Regions:
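Active-site neighborhood of HAD-like aspartate-dependent phosphohydrolases
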Residues: 1-40
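Solvent-exposed loop/turn and edge beta-strand elements of beta-rich ligand-binding domains
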Residues: 37-40, 68, 125, 179
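Asp-based, Mg2+/Mn2+-dependent phosphohydrolase catalytic module
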Residues: 1-3, 102, 111-207
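Conserved phosphate-coupling serine/threonine residues in phosphotransfer and NTP-handling enzymes
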Residues: 105-107
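A metal-dependent, Asp-based hydrolase signature
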Residues: 30-34, 44-79
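Alpha-helix C-terminal capping segments
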Residues: 43-47, 59-62, 89-99, 187-189, ...
Length: 207
């Protein structure tokens, strides 16, 4: 039975699309006020991707002007979500897991911790760990948590939606993974368990 859980935040505990207004409207307005050096069409595509991919990765992919990036990064470091967010309809499957639960999320610390606060779920988790993807990745943070809390990898299940991040890194460390893939974006990705929702999460955890 698994009784330690490393859980992603964005598009796992809650979905960004239904919360887009609260999460993104202010950021979109800010970016529209800048000369990003890309076409409107590319900006629309970038906005879509921002809902599921860390901002720095999106900016790199779509070629945002490098000279404006320090200003944008500074803005994002100081940004907080201040309106209530709604957890996913399946969140009760996560909440009812027995054991120690850690949120491991990529992004900007102030922004990510404010999301947890606005979701009203902070008390459901032992700790929240925000990964700065510009300097490290989730694999290094998983290793850090295992060492810090003296955890056995056989007891851990990693839950998330990113096949190229938490799922891939979990498997590389020999840890069981649950890939949440509602839109079947990763049909060929490796994962110990997978689902279009979280209804079989307890079975995967052996609970």
């Amino acid at each position: 039975m698994k009784h330690i859980f490393f859980i992603d935040l964005d598009n796992t505990i809650y979905f960004t699309k239904p919360n887009e207004e609260q999460l993104m409207s202010e950021l979109y307005r800010y970016l529209e006020s800048l000369d990003l050096g890309i076409s409107d069409e590319k900006f629309q595509l970038a906005k879509e991707e921002m809902l599921r991919t860390p901002f720095v990765k999106v900016a790199k992919k779509y070629g945002f002007k490098e000279e404006i990036m320090p200003e944008v990064i500074s803005y994002l470091h100081n940004r907080e979500v201040t309106k209530p967010l709604k957890p996913s309809d399946d969140y009760h499957y996560i909440k009812s897991l027995n054991g120690r639960k850690f949120i491991v999320t990529a992004g900007f610390p102030k922004q990510q911790t404010s999301k947890v606060k606005m979701l009203g779920i902070a008390d459901d988790f032992e700790a929240v760990h925000v990964v700065d993807v510009s300097t490290t990745n989730k694999k290094e943070v998983f290793k850090l948590l295992i060492d810090r809390y003296d955890l056995n990898t056989d007891d851990i299940l990693i839950i998330g939606d990113d096949a190229e991040s938490e799922i891939k890194f979990g498997l590389e460390l020999g840890i069981a993974t649950f890939l949440l893939d509602p839109e079947n974006l990763h049909p060929n990705a490796e994962s110990t368990f997978r689902g279009t929702d979280l209804s079989n999460l307890h079975t995967a955890a052996g609970q």
